[in-house]
Amino acid sequence: MCATLMPEPIIFAIPKGRILDEALPLLARVGIEPAADFFDKKSRALVFGTNQSHISLIRVRAFDVATFVAHGAAQLGIVGSDVVDEFDYSELYAPVDLGIGHCRLSLAGPEGGAPPGLGESHIRVATKYPATTRRWFAAQGIQAECIKLNGAMEIAPKLGLASHIVDLVSTGRTLVENALAEQKIISEVSARLIVNRAAFKLNSAEVPALVERFRQAVGDAAA
């Protein structure tokens, strides 16, 4: 009698913050339901079981999702396209736009001011996205000096740290409350399913099947 082969373990990285609430129903549609302790707000655990014994979830910062997956510590993850673009890891494959977590990455500056234009060769920008920001300005012939901040970008112009900021914008309310105005949209952002390329090739029984289930779930939701 042949023994039943157990599926290979899969680690799935999901982000804390704005995308998580929208990601949970999507996970449920592909048959992945977190264990009860995942929803315990007092828990400091970072690794959680699911209803599928071979699949575990890790809940980490959005920027760390890409790093865990790119280096093979997790096989799959969910993260915003802003993070995928910022790191541009060659080891990452982003096969499915999940259609959630919509916002935009924008350039903003003081109300009444103009965006950088022709004739300007240098600008100082406060941002969480230095690589993306430099690329965007370089395409316009402007050298961007990026001040890396992980939060409170909106006060940088007021305190003289930078003339502009590049940050995620949803409603724009935070900009208005800090006397800033959105000047240019750099990119539209949505959440993506990301996969470690090596895991996609080596775990051919499980990982590609999960990718297809996500693709189907997104298609069904859009229908």
Swiss-Prot record:
Q: Which residues form the signal peptide?
A: none
What molecular function terms (GO) are annotated for this protein?
ATP binding; ATP phosphoribosyltransferase activity
**Chief place of localization:** cytoplasm
Output the GO biological process annotations, alphabetical, semicolon-separated. L-histidine biosynthetic process
Q: Which reaction does it catalyse?
A: 1-(5-phospho-beta-D-ribosyl)-ATP + diphosphate = 5-phospho-alpha-D-ribose 1-diphosphate + ATP
Name the Gene3D superfamilies on file: Periplasmic binding protein-like II
Task: For this UniProt record, give its keywords in alphabetical order, as a comma-separated list.
Answer: Amino-acid biosynthesis, ATP-binding, Cytoplasm, Glycosyltransferase, Histidine biosynthesis, Nucleotide-binding, Transferase
Q: Name one Pfam family in it.
A: HisG
Subcellular localization, as worded in the UniProt entry? Cytoplasm
Q: What's a single GO CC term here?
A: cytoplasm
Q: Which domain of life is it from?
A: Bacteria
Question: What EC number(s) has UniProt assigned to this enzyme?
Answer: 2.4.2.17
Q: In which pathway does it act?
A: Amino-acid biosynthesis; L-histidine biosynthesis; L-histidine from 5-phospho-alpha-D-ribose 1-diphosphate: step 1/9
Domain comment quoted from the record: Lacks the C-terminal regulatory region which is replaced by HisZ.
Q: What does this protein do?
A: Catalyzes the condensation of ATP and 5-phosphoribose 1-diphosphate to form N'-(5'-phosphoribosyl)-ATP (PR-ATP). Has a crucial role in the pathway because the rate of histidine biosynthesis seems to be controlled primarily by regulation of HisG enzymatic activity.
Family as reported in the entry's similarity comment: Belongs to the ATP phosphoribosyltransferase family. Short subfamily.
Q: From the Swiss-Prot or TrEMBL record, give the protein name.
A: ATP phosphoribosyltransferase
Gene expressing this chain: hisG
